[in-house]
Structures are given as structure tokens and as C-alpha cells.
UniProtKB/Swiss-Prot annotation:
Biological role stated in the UniProt entry: Component of the anaphase promoting complex/cyclosome (APC/C), a cell cycle-regulated E3 ubiquitin-protein ligase complex that controls progression through mitosis and the G1 phase of the cell cycle. The APC/C complex controls several key steps in the cell cycle by mediating ubiquitination and subsequent degradation of target proteins such as cyclins. The APC/C complex is required for the female gametophyte development and is involved in several aspect of development by controlling cell division and cell elongation. Involved in the control of endoreduplication.
Homology family: Belongs to the APC6/CDC16 family.
The UniProt record lists the keyword Nucleus: yes
Tissue expression from the record: Widely expressed.
InterPro entries documented for this protein: TPR-like_helical_dom_sf, TPR_rpt
Pfam families from the UniProt entry: ANAPC3, TPR_1, TPR_7, TPR_8
Subcellular location: Nucleus
Protein name, per record: Anaphase-promoting complex subunit 6
Disulphides: none
Loss of function: phenotype: Gametophytic lethal phenotype.
Source organism of the structure: Arabidopsis thaliana (Mouse-ear cress)
């Protein structure tokens, strides 16, 4: 057969693959390989077999070829076949010997020399070495060697910043602390035209920077244009669903749950099967107590994705929201059974125990989550909260400090450190932690942070810094006028100052919120007696 005729059949194979006609592709690729015995045609046949899900046959074909030992493409495809067959040890053997350190630097196993993965700056294909590093990471992850998996994922993204999947695994499996994520991102060598990608990656990692910094990142990406003009409008990333899902996640971290919910709801109208956005939407609905939305989302997810952990996690969220914690726990457990690396279900499982004050089971679940997700500070933080609930304040403080080491920019960590210091009567330390909490809040203060402001006021009152205490109580009232603690604290501070008329006024406001509050009732009587003994304030008009 002439070369032109063979080339024509190669074209047929490529066309069959593009049209997903894999049996046809296998048929014609087999004939081309038989006619030429050329390595490229053998590789094309193996590709067709792989796409047609004939993994054993594809592996046998590649392994029988001597070139598999010399050509990285052959070795990588053979390893991909073993990945699909779940033969992870054999997959690692096929990929060859290499060592990696914690910085993601790869060394030759024989001579110990550093392997350089630099690629041509003009090359827009993913570096094959990066893909091999990523596959090694997946294999180690499947073998439960998360430390090696983390190192190989780092090696993959360092070998080629275009290998997004490696970064995705590092982020979603919480393998890195917030500082490690930032350090990794700053070490990546982006080409000049990939500046937008660097900005996008910076939006994907943990976002605890100040609002102005994060908003600037989003604004920069939203203004990124394609360089082409359609009609009179520029094409930008402003309405990209991935970018908007990142922004929704940021709103959730800032405790702006209503804003987050509205954005994710709009996104899911546009793209109802965007699963990352769906997860953020579920989290926002949980915080808002929107059980109807959780029910509808859970029903749709179970119908569309019955084999995904997210679907059963959504069912668990619904039951958790309506306070049926045993049922919630059952579905969180089902989600972790489907995907053991799905961190929200692991944490939700622990929370379902904590909600019923079953501390031992809750801490056991949190410890498992902390071991599996070393870059996520929430399990460690929740262990501290459980210890604090049982008045084991020193142990609680230790775990809060561990959480701070993992994520030093989350204001919630500093708030809990302040609370435990307050309980240990270390009021000066409590003031410092609460002030750090307010300093780390990325956006303007909202009602969610009102308890922190009140706690700071309480700590100042304990130090008898009444002026500062009153200032923060009044600041808390600008955030919420429904807090008994704020009114009673303000009343008591005025009472200590000898300002009985103001104290009486605020005790009344506190009792309006909770008429049977024993402390305010008793202190109101004391304040009235004190005012009688000191004479009626001339400024108070008697009716």
C-alpha cells in the first residue's frame, strides 16, 4: 500500500477519534500499525484502544513494544492503562524510579542529580514530565501515601504551571497550609503571556487577605480581554463561572452568606451542573438555615449524580439544617464512603456529633479529618472548641494555636483564642486576641462579628477599662440591636461607673429582650436602690 493511502487511513483514525467512534478508530489504527510497524502508528493504535476502554489490550500492546522503555509517551500511556485498572503499584513501577523532596524538586533515583523539567517557552503543550509527576501523585494518593502524593503534585505544577489538575488536587484535598499555597504559587515560572493564569491561581487558593487586595485580584481578572472585539464590546472573564464561583467562596469566608447565596443562585441558573459552585451554594444555604433550598438541591443532585459524594453530602446538609443529626450523620458517612477525600463530609460528620454534644465521637471524627487534610485548619479548630465546651481550656488553647499555625490569617481562630483566654481569666491576653480578630477580618464588620466585639468589650470591662468597654459595646449595637449580652454588659459597666440612670435604662432594654433574665432583674433592683441612695439624677425628668 502506498504512503499516501496509509496517510489517508491515519486521517480516518484521527477523524473517528474526534467523532468518538472508537471501535472504528481501533479497527483502522490496527491496520495502519500492521502495515507500517512504525512506533507512531503503534502509539496511535494504543491511544485508540485506551479511548475505547480496552485498557488491558492497550497495555499489552505498549508493553510488548521495546520502545516503551525509551519513549516517555509510551511509558505514560501504559501507566494510564494501569491507573484505569487500579493497579497502582504496577503503575508506579511503569513510571520509573525517581525521588522528590518536600519542595517538589525531583531527583534521579540512581545518581541523585536534580531532574530539570524546563520546557520550551514557545511550547503550549503540557510537559509530559509534569503529567508523569501528576500520575505518580494520583497513584500515591490511591495507596493512601498522602505525603508522597503532595510532593508529586507540587512537582507536577512546578514542572509545568499549565498542569491545573495538580493544583486542583492540592487545593481540594487541603494538602497545603495557606502559607504553603502562597509560597508554591510564587515559585511557579509562568511565561509572560500567562500572567492571567497566575492571577487566576491566586484567586483559587485560600483567600484570607484584606477585601481590597482580593477585590483587586478579581477586578484584574474581570478586565482580562481576549484581544478580539465582537461588535462594539470586548470579551472578558467578568462572567466566567469559575471566577464567579471563586468570588462566592470568598464571600462565604467573609461570612457574607446572603451575598454568597445570591451569587451562587445566579450562577446555578446559568450553569446548573457547576459542582464547585454547588458546594459553595450548599454551604451558604446551611448558614442561612434555608432548608427548602437544601431539600431541592439534594433531590436534584441525587437524581443527576447518584454516585457522587457531593449528592449525599447535600442530603446530610438538609437533615443537619432541620436538626435531625442522626440522619445527617448517616448521609455524611455515605458521602465519605464514596469519596474518602471529600473534606466537607468528613467535617460535617464530626459536626453532627458535636451538635448532640457527643464530644468523644466528634473529636474522633475531627482527628481523622485533621490527619487526612493537614492543610485544613477547621478540624483542629473544632477539636479545640470541643475541649473548650468541656472546660479543658489549656488543651483547647493548644489546639487553637495549632489551627493558627496552619492558617494564621483566619479571624475565627483568633476569636477562639480570645474566648479561651477570657475563660482562663487572662483578660489582657483576651483583649489582644480579640483585637487581632478584628484586624484580620477582611471586609467591613457585619452582624456575624458582633459577638467578637461584645467579647472584646467584656474583656475591657474585666480590666476595668470602662471607657474602652463602653466604646465597644456601643460599636456592637451598631451591628445588632438584638443582643442581650450587649445591653446587659453596657448596663453593668455604667453601673460600675456609678452612672445609675444609664445603667437602669440599659437593664430595661436587656429585660425587654429577655424578661426573665435573672442577672438583669437582680441588677436592675440593685441599680434602683443605688440611685435612690444617691438621689435622683437631675437630668432625668420625672413624669
Amino acid at each position: 500500500m502506498r504512503e499516501e493511502e496509509i496517510e489517508k487511513i491515519r486521517g480516518v483514525v484521527r477523524d473517528c477519534v474526534s467523532k468518538h467512534l472508537y471501535s472504528s478508530a481501533i479497527f483502522f489504527a490496527d491496520k495502519v500499525a500492521a502495515l507500517t510497524n512504525d512506533p507512531s502508528d503503534i502509539y496511535m493504535q494504543a491511544q485508540a484502544l485506551f479511548l475505547g476502554r480496552h485498557y488491558r489490550r492497550a497495555f499489552h500492546l505498549l508493553n510488548a513494544s521495546k520502545i516503551v522503555l525509551r519513549d516517555l509517551r509510551f511509558r505514560y500511556l501504559a501507566a494510564k492503562c494501569l491507573e484505569e485498572l487500579k493497579e497502582w503499584d504496577q503503575c508506579l513501577l511503569m513510571l520509573g524510579d525517581a525521588k522528590v523532596d518536600d519542595d517538589g524538586i525531583v531527583y534521579d533515583a540512581k545518581d541523585g542529580n536534580v531532574i530539570d523539567f524546563d520546557k520550551d517557552g514557545e511550547d503550549r503543550e503540557i510537559n509530559i514530565s509534569s503529567a508523569i509527576c501528576f500520575l505518580r501523585g494520583k497513584a500515591y494518593g490511591a495507596l493512601q501515601n498522602r505525603s508522597q502524593a503532595r510532593q508529586w503534585y507540587k512537582a507536577a505544577i512546578k514542572a509545568d504551571p499549565l498542569c491545573y489538575e495538580a493544583l486542583e488536587c492540592l487545593i481540594e484535598s487541603h494538602m497545603l497550609t495557606s502559607e504553603e499555597e502562597s509560597s508554591l504559587l510564587s515559585s511557579l515560572q509562568f511565561s509572560p503571556e500567562d500572567g492571567w493564569l497566575s492571577s487566576f491561581y491566586s484567586c483559587l487558593i485560600k483567600k484570607y487577605d484584606k477585601e481590597s487586595t482580593v477585590e483587586l485580584k478579581f477586578k484584574k481578572l474581570e478586565n482580562e480581554t481576549s484581544g478580539s472585539v465582537s461588535g462594539s464590546s470586548m470579551i472578558t472573564l467578568a462572567n466566567n463561572t469559575d471566577l464567579l464561583a471563586c468570588k462566592a467562596e470568598y464571600y462565604h469566608q467573609c461570612c457574607e452568606y446572603q451575598k454568597c447565596f445570591e451569587l451562587t443562585a445566579a450562577l446555578l441558573e446559568k450553569d446548573p451542573f457547576h459542582l464547585k459552585c454547588t458546594l459553595v451554594h450548599l454551604a451558604a444555604a446551611m448558614e442561612l438555615g434555608n432548608s427548602n433550598e437544601l431539600y431541592l438541591m439534594a433531590c436534584n443532585l441525587v437524581k443527576d449524580y447518584p454516585s457522587k459524594a457531593l449528592s449525599w453530602f447535600a442530603v446530610g446538609c438538609y437533615y443537619y439544617c432541620i436538626k435531625k443529626y442522626a440522619e445527617a450523620r448517616r448521609y455524611f458517612s455515605k458521602a465519605t464512603g464514596i469519596d474518602g477525600s471529600f473534606s466537607p463530609a468528613r467535617i460535617g460528620y464530626g459536626n453532627s456529633f458535636a451538635a448532640q454534644e457527643e464530644g468523644d465521637q466528634a473529636m474522633s471524627a475531627y482527628r481523622t479529618a485533621a490527619r487526612l487534610f493537614p492543610g485544613c485548619h477547621l478540624p483542629t479548630l473544632y477539636i479545640g472548641m470541643e475541649y473548650m465546651r468541656t472546660h479543658s481550656y489549656k488543651l483547647a488553647d493548644q489546639f487553637f494555636m495549632q489551627a493558627k499555625a496552619i492558617c494564621p490569617s483566619d479571624p475565627l481562630v483568633y476569636n477562639e483564642l480570645g474566648v479561651v483566654a477570657y475563660h482562663m481569666k487572662e483578660y489582657g491576653k483576651a483583649v489582644r486576641w480579640f483585637e487581632k480578630t478584628l484586624a484580620h477580618i477582611p471586609s467591613a464588620l457585619t452582624e456575624s462579628w458582633e459577638p467578637t466585639v461584645v467579647n472584646l468589650a467584656h474583656a475591657y470591662r474585666k480590666l476595668r477599662k470602662d471607657r474602652e468597654a463602653i466604646s465597644y459595646y456601643e460599636r456592637a449595637l451598631t451591628l445588632s440591636t438584638k443582643s442581650l449580652s450587649t445591653y446587659s454588659g453596657l448596663a453593668y459597666t455604667y453601673h460600675l461607673q456609678g452612672n445609675f440612670s444609664a445603667a437602669i435604662s440599659y437593664y430595661h432594654k436587656a429585660l425587654w429582650l429577655k424578661p426573665d433574665d435573672q442577672f438583669c432583674t437582680e441588677m436592675l433592683n440593685v441599680a434602683l436602690m443605688d440611685e435612690c441612695q444617691n438621689g435622683v439624677d437631675s437630668k432625668v425628668e420625672l413624669c
